[in-house]
UniProtKB/Swiss-Prot annotation:
Subunit details: Homodimer.
Name the record gives this protein: Biotin synthase
Listed GO MF terms: 2 iron, 2 sulfur cluster binding; 4 iron, 4 sulfur cluster binding; biotin synthase activity; iron ion binding
EC nos: 2.8.1.6
Protein family: Belongs to the radical SAM superfamily. Biotin synthase family.
Entry keyword set: 2Fe-2S, 4Fe-4S, Biotin biosynthesis, Iron, Iron-sulfur, Metal-binding, S-adenosyl-L-methionine, Transferase
Residues at which [4Fe-4S] cluster binds: C13, C17, C20
Organism: Campylobacter fetus subsp. fetus (strain 82-40)
Pfam families: BATS, Radical_SAM
Stored HAMAP family: BioB
Length: 275
């Protein structure tokens, strides 16, 4: 399964997540803009569809889904359901109430992405402006609203093996439809100063996640190209069944045509429906 990301709004986030270059607490050299227009979003959706993406995720920066943001995401989703009906729409808009998530469900959003990021115990070391429990509760709200969950996190922040076990146990409790795995990429502007994970450790993380969540679609996302390099397609032999195709929020991804060619050469077919 291939999924693409649309960075609807970028940067200037008031939260202090230590792994994120979109935080206004640091000065990272990233694109910053308030909001893409509907035409830009539609163009990206059409490109994603041509690249065999099944999922298309509408991502906004900031703490949560306020009324103004909700209205725009609903407008964008309504347009995309009409213009690109083959895409399964995912929303990633931060903390959200049950009532707001019900509105997303009504306009055809299939899944809500809100990552736990790491263990409950380790989270205070990487973020102080909101709590891990806020994230967990938003996922509960999404389930209650009838949305599928897309919930995962990021590895390589300095967390311990016990943290990883605790994190995956929490994911198992939520039982998400899909679970993205991101690998931390160092950036001089970030407070976290951790080296890249080794390729072998990254593949082990994927295997361990797949064992913990056997019914879940394990998606390898940010850091795939840099951490795994020329071994990146081994993820599909180690428990992953989905990848993000194209660019990420603030970093470039693998060239889509290369991913498509490499996957085809390995005998993979691209999913045309979520199941």
């Amino acid at each position: 399964m291939l999924c693409a990301i649309c960075n609807v709004s970028s940067g200037n986030c008031a939260e202090d997540c230590a792994y994120c270059t979109q935080s206004a607490h640091i000065k990272a050299d990233i694109p910053k803009f308030k909001q893409k227009n509907l035409e830009q979003i539609l163009n990206e959706a059409k490109i994603a569809s041509k690249n065999y993406a099944l999922g298309f995720c509408l991502v906004t920066s900031g703490l949560g889904l306020d009324d103004k943001k909700l209205e725009f995401i609903c407008e964008a989703a309504t347009m995309l359901r009409k213009e690109t009906p083959n895409l399964m729409l995912i929303a990633c808009n931060g903390s959200a109430s049950y009532e707001s998530l019900k509105e997303l469900k009504k306009v055809g959003i299939f899944s809500y992405n809100h990552n736990l990021e790491t263990s409950r115990e380790f989270f205070p070391q990487i973020c102080t402006t909101h709590s891990w429990d806020d994230r967990f509760n938003t996922n509960l709200n999404a389930k209650k609203a009838g949305l599928e969950l897309c919930c995962g996190g990021i590895y390589g922040l300095g967390e311990s093996q016990d943290d990883r076990l605790s994190f995956r146990a929490s994911l198992k409790e939520l039982n998400p439809f899909s679970s993205p795995i991101n690998f931390f990429i160092p950036n001089p502007a970030l407070k976290i100063k951790q080296p890249l994970l080794s390729t072998d450790e990254a593949l082990e993380i994927i295997r361990d996640t797949a064992k913990t969540l056997p019914q879940c679609r394990i998606m390898v996302a940010g850091g795939r190209e840099i951490v795994l390099g020329d071994r990146q397609y081994e993820i599909l032999e180690n428990g992953a069944s989905a990848i993000v195709i194209g660019d990420y929020l603030t970093t470039s991804g693998e060239v889509a045509s290369k991913d498509i060619e490499e996957l085809r050469n390995r005998g993979f077919e691209f999913a045309s429906q979520c199941h």
